[in-house]
Amino acid sequence: MKVTNKYNLPQPLYNLVNSEYTYKDKQFSATAILQGLKSLILTKRHTDEIEQDVSDMANLIFGLALHKVLEDSQEGDDELKEAYLVYMLENGYKVSGRFDLYNETEMSVKDYKTCSVWKLKFKDFDDWKKQLHIYAWLLTKCDFQVDKCEINYFIKDWSPKEFKIAQLKGEYYPEHAIGKVEFTFTKEDFVEIEKYIVERFNQIATYETLEDDEIPVCSEEERWYSGSKWA
């Protein structure tokens, strides 16, 4: 993807987002495979033809800026921070993932997310859980034990006024702009996520042999997915 800076915004902003768009042969990230596969493959195939201006990438900048700040924090002796893992599947493709923190004592993988308040109101956590589950699966391939995951969220549009209104109406609204949600994993969950990963990459391997117009269209669920959130 070609990132432009038509409005001459500060160079650090441009550098921040421009470093995000790199593709490797036969390798896709945990986040990427949650997208519609046709969109994923066509974006990779035609990346040099796609253009986006830094002025339209506020959501990405917010998320990256948050991670840059948290990178400076000191991890504990039982913690692994900002680790990048890659695992090769039997078909020669690789799945990668970069999680924010793993705590060996808690046997928990953790990630930081920026989101809209609607994410919490609708409790729409399926994509978060699946992404962290893939990270957990990658960790188990490196002989780490993972029993749960934790999402630490930062709500960008949280409003104290809306919170008070929701209280008066008896409606749910998150009490704070920063919080966390947790999920636990069973052995059966790891069997299922491995099956999902293998099937996903087998589909990718098949689709990459097809012409653009021969690749099946994304499912309705996939079309609603937008990378870090559901539209």
Stretches with model-predicted labels:
Residues M1-V109, S116-F122, D126, T140, ...:
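Metal-dependent nuclease catalytic cores that hydrolyze phosphodiester bonds in DNA/RNA
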Residues M1-Y7, L138-A231:
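Metal-dependent nuclease catalytic regions and adjoining charged, substrate-binding loops involved
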Residues V54-D56, Q131-H133, Y173, T206-Y207:
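Short, surface-exposed linear patches
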Residues A58-L66, Q131, D189, I193:
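Short amphipathic alpha-helical segments
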Residues W128-T140:
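An active-site-proximal "capping" alpha-helix that borders the catalytic cofactor pocket
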